[in-house]
Amino acid sequence: MMKRTLLIASALLLLGSSRVSAESKIVNNGNGTATVICSQGLLGPEKWDKQVKPIDKKGYITIFDGKSLGGWRGYGKNHIPSKWEVTPDGCLSFKGKEAAKDEEGGDLIFAHKFKNFELTLQWKVDKGSNSGILYLAQEVIKPDGSKVEPIYISAPEYQVLDNQNHPDAKLGKDHNRQSASLYDMIPAKPQNSKPYGEWNEAKIRVQNGTVSHYQNGVLVVQYKLWTPEWTKMLQASKFSEAKWPVAFYLLDNCGGANHEGYIGLQDHGDRVWYRNIKVKEL
C-alpha cells in the first residue's frame, strides 16, 4: 500500500493548488459582458489573463463565439495547437487527418476552472470520427516535470462519436462508449445521436456532484460524483485501481480538493467541429 501511495504521489504534481486562489469568480459587468480570469500556461511563472466575454440575460457566457479563441489554450501548453482552427463558418474544429504532418495536436481547454456549471454546445463529426468533451479536468505533471498526463485520466468524458462507423461504438459494455455516454462507464439512454455530418446538441450540468448529460434535448446520463457508487463504477472500468492506479486516484477524487476544473475538447486524431459553446455558473 505504501509503495502504491508513493507511486501515485510522485505522479500527481498538480499545478492547481497555488492557482485556485487567483481564479476568482466570474464577474458580470452589467453591460452584456462578463470578465473571466484565465490561466495563460501550465509550466513556468503563473500568468493570468482577463477575458471579457458576452453574457446573456440567463447568465450563459459565450466562451467560443465563432471568431475568437481568447481564454482557450492547449492542455498543458500556453498556446493553441495548430491542428485546432476557427473555420470561416464560425466553428472550432480539429483538423484530424487533414492537418499537415508538421502541425501540432493536443487537447484544448478553456483555461478557467468551473465548479458548479451548465455547459451547452453543438458538435458534429466526420465519418468514423471520435472526440470528447471533458470536464473538471486537472493539469497533471508527470514525474520528470516536463510533460502532462493525458487529460482523460483526471476528467469525466462526455463521448463524441460517429456511432455508425467508429469501432469504439461496439466496444466497452452495453454501448457505454457511444456518443453522450459517460465514457466507459454509463451508456447514454436513449441513444439519440444524429449521423456524422449533422449537428448534435450537447449539455452537461454539474451541481454539487450530480452530473447530467443531455443529447439533443434529452437527459441520457445522470450520476453522482464522490460516492461509493462512483468508486464502484471506476473499479469496473478501464480506469480501475488494478488497471490504471493513477487514473483511478484522480477520477475518484475528480476536481481535486476544490471540486473544480477545466472544460476540455479532445484531440483523438479525427475531424470534429464544435460551435456555440456557452457556460453558466450555477
Language model features with spans:
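C-terminal segment of classical bacterial N-terminal signal peptides
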Residues: 15-20
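Sec-dependent N-terminal signal peptides
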Residues: 5-14
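Carbohydrate-interacting regions of secretory-pathway proteins
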Residues: 22-282
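N-terminal secretory signal peptides that target proteins for export/translocation
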Residues: 1-2
